[in-house]
């Protein structure tokens, strides 16, 4: 059974000031909770969370793990817009992900059980990943750039036959890491 709980507190002002919204589970639209879509600081008290810049779990994703984020550039270098969030499902602490060169699990395949800051350093010949299988207990974050930079995508256990299955507009993936969940 997946662990899908935790607590995240969103603040309108920097450094945990202004109006706040406490969230304990899926929240598909902050405005429905009487909270504007401007978030300038966040405190993750437990769990790992994926936040989206639009309501209904759409748009750019941001992974937030246990800790304080006093200003929005700590999780997003572009703006303070955020519309929805949900806890990341965690099953335990055994991590495994297989990446594939082609859609539908074809072509070159490489397995990871640890973080990888640059896929090409592990023998991955391209900057693209077209399909993924996430096994084991934990979730993973994919990044479009090396060293855990650029647009990110959170993947939980399951099969992703094409990059659009994880919400990407392109197959560009150059680094990946495990989501570590602290309660």
From Swiss-Prot:
* Listed transmembrane segments: none
Key words of the record: Eye lens protein, Repeat
Tissue note:
Primordially eye-specific. Present in lens nucleus. In the retina, expression in observed in the outer plexiform layer (containing photoreceptors axons and synapses) and photoreceptor outer segments (at protein level). Also detected in the auditory hindbrain where it is highly expressed in the medial nucleus of the trapezoid body, but also present in other nuclei of the superior olivary complex.
Q: Name one GO biological process term.
A: eye development
SUPFAM superfamilies for the chain: gamma-Crystallin-like
MF GO annotations: structural constituent of eye lens
Which stretches make up the Beta/gamma crystallin 'Greek key' domain?
6-46, 47-89, 95-136, 138-180
Q: Which Gene3D superfamilies match?
A: Crystallins (2.60.20.10)
Per the record, what about its domains? Has a two-domain beta-structure, folded into four very similar Greek key motifs.
Q: What is annotated about its quaternary structure and interactions?
A: Monomer.
* Role: Crystallins are the dominant structural components of the vertebrate eye lens. Also plays an important role for integrity and function of auditory nuclei.
Family note = Belongs to the beta/gamma-crystallin family.
Q: What is the protein name given in its UniProt record?
A: Gamma-crystallin N
Could you tell me the gene encoding this protein?
A: Crygn
């Amino acid at each position: 059974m997946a662990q899908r709980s935790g607590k995240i507190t969103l603040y309108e002002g920097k450094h945990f000031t202004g109006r706040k919204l406490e969230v304990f589970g899926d929240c598909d639209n902050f405005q429905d909770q009487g909270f504007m879509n401007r978030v300038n600081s966040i405190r993750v008290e437990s769990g790992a969370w994926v936040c989206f810049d639009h309501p209904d779990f759409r748009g750019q994703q941001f992974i937030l793990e246990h800790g304080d984020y006093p200003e929005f550039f700590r999780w997003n270098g572009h703006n303070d817009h955020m519309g929805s969030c949900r806890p990341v499902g965690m099953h335990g602490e055994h991590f495994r992900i297989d990446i594939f060169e082609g859609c539908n699990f074809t072509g070159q395949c490489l397995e990871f059980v640890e973080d990888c800051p640059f896929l090409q350093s592990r023998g991955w010949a391209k900057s693209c990943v077209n399909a993924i299988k996430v096994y084991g207990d934990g979730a993973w974050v994919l990044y479009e750039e090396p060293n855990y930079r650029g647009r990110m995508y959170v993947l939980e256990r399951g099969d992703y036959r094409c990059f659009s299955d994880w919400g990407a507009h392109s197959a560009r993936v150059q680094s990946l890491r495990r989501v570590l969940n602290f309660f």
